[in-house]
C-alpha cells in the first residue's frame, strides 16, 4: 500500500510541476489590448459633417476576428471588452451601431473597423473610427422648375429594400441602404393663355445604382426655357438627363 501512495504522490507532484512550467509559456505568447471607438458624421465626397444623431459609445457592438489565426469573439458593447489578453497575431476589430435595414430621416447607421497586431508582453491600444454606413439622398427642384410646373408636382423615392418616401418638399437628407434607388415624379404644367388647366406630365424615372456608403447624392430637377422648354436632371451638379418637354414628355401626359 505504501508503494501505491508513493506512486500517486509522485504523479501529482509531476502534474503540478508540469502545469507551473506551462503557465509562463502561455503568458509569453499573449499581449494586452484596449479598444476605443470614436464617431464622425463626415461624408466622403464633401468632407463636411452632416446633421444626424450620433450614437453613444456604449451603443456600439464589437466583433474581433483573427486574421493570422482562427479566432472570433463578439461583445454587445465596446465597453464590455475593456482590457483583455490575446495571443500573438493579427486581428480585426469591427464596431457597429444601427441597422442598415432601417431607412429614413435621421436613421444613420455607423460602422468601422481597424486591424491590429498583438505582440507578446506588450500593450496595444486600438482606436476604431466609426463612419456613416448609409447613402444620403436629397431631391431638389429649382425656382424655374416650380414656375414652369405651377400646377404642382409630386416626387416619390423608392429604395431597394421596398421603402417609399414622399420627397416633394425634402429639406433633409434621407438615409438609405447603399444599394439603389428610383425617383418617380409627376408635374402639372402651368395653365395656358386660354385658361385651360395645365397637363399632368409623368417625368422620366431616375434610377441610381451602386450607391456608396458615406456619400451624398443630390438629385436636382430644373427647367430651361431658352428656346424649347427642356427638363434637366442633375446628380451632384452633373447632367444625367435632358428631355424636351413638349416633344418628348407630353406623350406621357
Model-inferred region functions:
Residues 1-16:
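Sec-dependent bacterial lipoprotein signal peptides
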